[in-house]
C-alpha cells in the first residue's frame, strides 16, 4: 500500500508483525503520523525505566525487570537514558512520571499495579497527567472471566485506570488476553518478573527501531595512557552519532581497558574503530 511521508522524513521498512514499519526521524512528524495500517516508529527512540516499590529500596526483593528490559531495549534499537527506583508514594511517583515522560519517547514503569494497599502506580500516573481514575469495562470483564468465582472486590482495583488511557494488546500471544495500560507515552507494567516479561513480549515489536551497532577494542595500555586518543575519537565522530565508552578491567589477562564504540550508522562505527586503533597502535590487544 502507498504511504505519504511527512516532510520526506520517513524511511520505510518491512516487519514480520506489521505490513510496513515507517521509521520517522522527526518527533513532530511522529506525533502527527496518521493512524492506518502502517506503524510509525521513531528512527532514534529513547526510553527510561521507573522501578516502583519499597521492597526494592529495602533490599527485600531484588529487581529483575530493569536488567531484563535493558537488554530487550538494546536489541530493539531503543536508547535507554535513565533508570530510577522510587518508593510506593503517589506524589513522588506522579512527579517522576511527569518529569521523565517529558524527556524520553517511552517511559516504562515496573511495579505497583496489583490489588493491595501499596499498588498505587496507576493512581499516580493519573495524577501526573491530571486524569481521574475510573473502572475500565474491558479490564473488569477480563478479571471476572479470569478469576471466576474466586474474584473478590479488591481484585477489581486492577481495572481502575486513568480516564483516557489506552489498552495496548500488541501482536504477542499474551496481548490477545491481557493488554498493557498505556497513558500517553507511559507503559505501565507489573512488578512480578514473569508477568512483566510476558506482557512486554506481547508488545515488544511496537518498539523496534533501526539497530544500534556496536564494536569493541581492547587496549593493553591503561586509561590514563589512552585518554588523549579517546578524546580525539569522540571529537571526530560525535557529529555522526557515535558514542565511545571506556571500561577498565583490572583482572583481565591480556588487556587493561575495554573500549566500546556504538552508533546507528555501522560505517561510522567502523571508521571510528579504525581511527582509534590507528592512534593506539601496538596497545591494541584485539578488536571485535
What are these regions (language model features)?
Residues 4-6:
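Residue-level detector of structural "landmarks"
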Residues 14-19, 25-26:
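Low-acidity, Ser/Thr- and Arg-rich intrinsically disordered low-complexity segments
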Residues 33, 41-91:
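ATP/NTP phosphate-donor binding region
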Residues 52-54, 109-117, 191, 247, ...:
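Glycine-rich beta-strand-to-loop/alpha-helix junction loops that act as flexible
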Residues 67-127:
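N-terminal small/polar loop signature for handling phosphorylated ligands or for N-terminal nucleophile
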Residues 92-95, 119-209:
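Proline/glycine-rich low-complexity loops and linkers
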Residues 184-279:
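An accessory alpha-helical subdomain
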Residues 280-288:
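Conserved short beta-strand edge segments in small beta-sheet-based binding/regulatory domains
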Amino acid at each position: 500500500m502507498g504511504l505519504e511521508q511527512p516532510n520526506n522524513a520517513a524511511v520505510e521498512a518491512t516487519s514480520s508483525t506489521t505490513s510496513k514499519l515507517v521509521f520517522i526521524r522527526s518527533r513532530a512528524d511522529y506525533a502527527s503520523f496518521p493512524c492506518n495500517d502502517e506503524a510509525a516508529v521513531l528512527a532514534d527512540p529513547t526510553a527510561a525505566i521507573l522501578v516502583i516499590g519499597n521492597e526494592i529500596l529495602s533490599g527485600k526483593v531484588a529487581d529483575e525487570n530493569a536488567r531484563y528490559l535493558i537488554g530487550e531495549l538494546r536489541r530493539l534499537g531503543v536508547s535507554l537514558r535513565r533508570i530510577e527506583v522510587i518508593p510506593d508514594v503517589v506524589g513522588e511517583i506522579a512527579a517522576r512520571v511527569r518529569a521523565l515522560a517529558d524527556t524520553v519517547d517511552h517511559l516504562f514503569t515496573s511495579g505497583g499495579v496489583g490489588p493491595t494497599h501499596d499498588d498505587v502506580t496507576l493512581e499516580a500516573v493519573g495524577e501526573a497527567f491530571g486524569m481521574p481514575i475510573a473502572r475500565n469495562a474491558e479490564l473488569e470483564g477480563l478479571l471476572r472471566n479470569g478469576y471466576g468465582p474466586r474474584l473478590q472486590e479488591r481484585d477489581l482495583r486492577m481495572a481502575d485506570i486513568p480516564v483516557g488511557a489506552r489498552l495496548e494488546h500488541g501482536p504477542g500471544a499474551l496481548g490477545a488476553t491481557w493488554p498493557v495500560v498505556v497513558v500517553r507515552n507511559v507503559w505501565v507494567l507489573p512488578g512480578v518478573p514473569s508477568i512483566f516479561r510476558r506482557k512486554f513480549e506481547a508488545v515488544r515489536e511496537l518498539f523496534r527501531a533501526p539497530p544500534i551497532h556496536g564494536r569493541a577494542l581492547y587496549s593493553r595500555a591503561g586509561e590514563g595512557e589512552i585518554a588523549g586518543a579517546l578524546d580525539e575519537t569522540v571529537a571526530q565522530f560525535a557529529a555522526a552519532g557515535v558514542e565511545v565508552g571506556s571500561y577498565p578491567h583490572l583482572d583481565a589477562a591480556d588487556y587493561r581497558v575495554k573500549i566500546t564504540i556504538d552508533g546507528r550508522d555501522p560505517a561510522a562505527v567502523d571508521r571510528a574503530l579504525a581511527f582509534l586503533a590507528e592512534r593506539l597502535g601496538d596497545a591494541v590487544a584485539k578488536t571485535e
